[in-house]
């Protein structure tokens, strides 16, 4: 990626700078000290992977000599605005109050009752620390896929969105780089793609989005959304892999048209080896059964799915070029996203629109 293209991205999508902020790890010794000081806890500490936050698994001996007790400590990245971190915190508190049956992490208050602790790390940078429950389960990518699992994912997302609809927060409308409403702003990345076939494929999907979705998004039901309901953020029960046992990572939350959240999730459910449209229509129908959608929302789902896939291949490719040491992690969805985009582009949007309306009875 050339410097010129990078400058164009930051000009059109300035909030993307947080995605390229250098890693800001914190020493385990400091984390242990914070746990003792603020939560009165001690135990074995293991650093976990994370896109921006520094994450640590705390394992403590059980008082009753049973299974060890585990908690997750999240330390925010200094480049993340405090308001954004608080939005995520308030979402978890909101869900605990209004939808306690949903399998999301619970916040563990510090000794003074605070669920978020502000502190300066050894490097002098401000951080926010939050201690959460540790969700057990098998990461969905490691589990067998099935139609029942897809239906479970869609139904759970519908219930999550229904619960989040009443959440209000001043950071909900802040600009985020992963906002499908702004998919057209990655065009500079798409136009710079070296492969002419892939470039044309992505350009076509952006054109479809700009002509058939973008002008109509503003009239659709809008609310806080998870905005990253992909299989890497979901856990399943190993004994019943069709059942979702955990929802992770509220770090990309934003207020957006409700259908955007479904589009993000559906983009990761496209079956490239079978019926691509069928998997998306079944997914939409399962969501609709829990949280009814209107015809105007369904009419935009197909171009929105493709727009999300374009964003995945464009943004992750750009980030990998700027952060080659992190490329394997960043590009883990790249190849399959290209395949999904190609499968979707092969189906006329009018056919997809009719199939979605039929599947949902609209």
Where are these regions (language model features)?
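A conserved alpha-helical element in kinase catalytic cores
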Residues: 75-126, 143, 147-151
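Active-site activation/catalytic loop segments of kinase-like enzymes and analogous catalytic loops
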Residues: 258-292, 306-324
């Amino acid at each position: 990626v050339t410097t010129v293209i990078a400058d164009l991205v930051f000009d059109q999508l300035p909030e993307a700078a947080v995605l390229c902020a250098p890693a800001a790890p914190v020493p385990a010794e400091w984390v242990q000290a914070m746990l003792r000081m603020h939560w009165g806890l001690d135990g074995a500490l293991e650093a976990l992977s994370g896109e921006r936050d520094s994450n640590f698994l705390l394992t403590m001996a059980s008082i009753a000599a049973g299974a060890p007790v585990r908690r997750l400590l999240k330390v925010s990245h200094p480049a993340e605005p405090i308001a954004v971190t608080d939005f995520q915190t308030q979402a978890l508190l909101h869900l605990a109050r209004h939808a306690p049956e949903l399998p999301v992490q619970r916040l563990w208050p510090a000794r003074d009752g605070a669920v978020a602790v502000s502190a300066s790390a050894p490097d002098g940078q401000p951080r926010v620390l939050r201690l959460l429950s540790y969700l057990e389960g098998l990461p969905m990518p490691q589990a067998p896929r099935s139609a029942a699992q897809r239906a479970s994912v869609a139904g759970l997302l519908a219930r999550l969105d229904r619960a989040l609809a009443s959440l209000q927060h001043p950071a909900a409308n802040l600009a985020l780089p992963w906002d499908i409403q702004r998919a057209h702003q990655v065009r500079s990345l798409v136009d710079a793609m070296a492969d002419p076939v892939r470039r044309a494929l992505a350009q076509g999907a952006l054109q479809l989005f700009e002509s058939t979705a973008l002008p109509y998004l503003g009239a659709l039901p809008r609310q806080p959304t998870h905005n990253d309901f992909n299989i890497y953020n979901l856990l399943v029960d190993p004994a019943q892999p069709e059942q979702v046992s955990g929802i992770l990572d509220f770090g990309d939350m934003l207020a957006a048209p409700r259908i955007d959240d479904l589009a993000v999730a559906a983009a990761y459910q496209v079956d490239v080896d079978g019926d691509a449209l069928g998997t998306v229509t079944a997914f939409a129908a399962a969501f609709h059964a829990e949280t009814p959608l209107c015809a105007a929302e369904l009419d935009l789902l197909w171009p929105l799915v493709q727009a999300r896939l374009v964003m995945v291949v464009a943004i992750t490719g750009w980030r990998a070029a700027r952060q080659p040491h992190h490329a394997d992690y960043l590009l883990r969805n790249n190849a399959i996203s290209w395949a999904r985009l190609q499968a979707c582009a092969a189906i006329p949007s009018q056919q997809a629109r009719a199939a979605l309306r039929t599947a949902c009875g609209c």
